[in-house]
Amino acid sequence: MAEKKTAAKGYQKFKADLAAGTLGEVYIFCGEESYLREYYLKEVQKKLVPAGFEEFNFHRVAGKGLTMEELTEMTEAMPMMAERTLIVVTDCDLYKLGEEQRTRLIALLDDFPEYCCLIFVYDLVEYKPNKTYKKLYAALSDKAQEVRFEPQDKSDLINWIARRFRATGHDIDARTAEHLMFTCGSLMTGLVPEIEKIGAYAKGRAVTVEDINAVADPVLDAVVFDMTSAVTKGDYDRASELLGQLLKKQEEPIMILGVISKELRRLYTARLALDSGKDKLWLMDLWNMRSDYPARLLLEAARKSTHEWCVNSLALCQKLDRRMKSEKGIDREGELKLLLMQLAQRA
């Protein structure tokens, strides 16, 4: 929880500094919300780099193969017709630099020019601070501001979704927006093309759940939720149909099994919640849910299952997981279909 508060604080401070025109010198941009990250990179560029002078004042380089000597040389270049320069370095894993390069980076941070803004962007590489490298960790903690772009809060995301749909000539209410988030995930990067697709398909002014279900491309978790809901109702045909859709998308059977197991664990905890008098808020806290929508769906599905069924289902998943990881030549797709049949028969 403390980590989340620190990450949120860094993000909010960055936004405030950007708005006030008091941007710092060195930033580390990380987190899975790439849409938001790219948006703010453009905003920083607008703030610091005058149009027409990008060639002199803005440099975006790949981190792979970049030396700290080259980076230092870029930071020392004076701005032209501007107060500051902007350098964006993508996927330079700072904690995997060799000792000499770490030393040069520390020296650069200790005497960093005020007229330069340097942003290390972690896109495909995950940012993992490593306290083993004490001097580098201390230098980055002191001189660089970490800005973590995470999925937005429920209310902020619903408002953003509504604005995007208004741009397509449609409205969407909060409950329908929650269904979209559940179906397509909560990352803006993934939602943008889905909103455009749904906006082009919808006939009425108001977007409906049916519009979303008709054309949206659901994320793996959403499909598996529908699959487990089908087996709790004993509907093997529907569960098998959904499994077939995932396999056509080239999803790995071991990955599908992992998500099925996770969903059944969530269903088990929902059953425990019902049996012990706990509510959706307990489930939301347990599974770190940003919205009560999936919690309500879980409780609804749990009412159709028993404690014994949940325990037996998890045992079947664990057994198949061990077999998939240890047996050679196993028909993984066939075993998944058999698992769904067993789950549906016991429901």
Residue ranges with predicted function:
Residues 1-347:
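Conserved beta/loop motifs at nucleotide-recognition and modification sites
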